[in-house]
């Protein structure tokens, strides 16, 4: 090999890299899974509570025991995708702060499947987040990291971490990570679809079309949520489209640092970036601190954030490393 040709950088997760290899095939081979359906008549729809690209979500009632539940009616998508979501939910059953799948039913005529979940009395994040204290932010961030560490330890990337998918019952101080429709099994060295996560929460790896990503994608999304919480912003990086999203990130993390990342993994940037990227120095996190957020954006919070929001996915803290950070010491 000639000197100028560097060997391609192999990117493998620093943790839980081989979980699925060590599991029996049926653990991750969702395509060959046989679902068992319950009875649709056991559930009644009360009211609509949300809708997504792939589903409509209702508050429901289990008529057998008169308990509330959530009914997620799936829109027609590839059945393989539905199987993946079910398999992942079953694999994660009972994990800390993971939403519980109670039943799977389907309409006898239309064959439309619905997933029945535990009920969480959620307060919309736009209402809740501005009211959270410093302690609350530490507490709920830690609870979310528990859920993420658990799914990662089971060989699963969530790939859609954002406030809309974190249900919080503030009265009970209960957090649940929901919507596992984009979640996927991690196999080291495998190339994945970069069309995952919501724009404002997409990691740089997705925006530069790097397909060999891993669990650290979820850490980026978590970091973006955390930044918005401590700096009291609605959204921390708010791009107009996927290209502009990377520009918004570069204006904070710097362009030299972006080029170093791209070079390390031998990524070829889309030519569209030539005209829009410009040149930006890395911004100091303290430049986002103001009178309004000073009590939340303290030294420990900023040190943690700095270790989460890194271009290089291999440099980001893992969930366990983040949970061991001094920021969370007060909870222990």
From Swiss-Prot:
It is an enzyme of class 2 (transferase). SUPFAM superfamilies: Protein kinase-like (PK-like). Its EC number is 2.7.11.1. GO terms for biological process: DNA damage response; establishment or maintenance of cell polarity; negative regulation of transcription by RNA polymerase II; positive regulation of establishment or maintenance of bipolar cell polarity regulating cell shape; regulation of cell cycle; regulation of establishment or maintenance of bipolar cell polarity; regulation of mRNA splicing, via spliceosome; signaling. InterPro entries: CK2_alpha, Kinase-like_dom_sf, Prot_kinase_dom, Protein_kinase_ATP_BS, Ser/Thr_kinase_AS. It holds the Pfam family Pkinase. The keyword Kinase applies. ATP binds at residues 49-57, 72. Residues 43-327 form the Protein kinase domain. Catalytic subunit of a constitutively active serine/threonine-protein kinase complex that phosphorylates a large number of substrates containing acidic residues C-terminal to the phosphorylated serine or threonine. This is Casein kinase II subunit alpha. The lineage of its organism: Eukaryota, Fungi, Dikarya, Ascomycota, Taphrinomycotina.
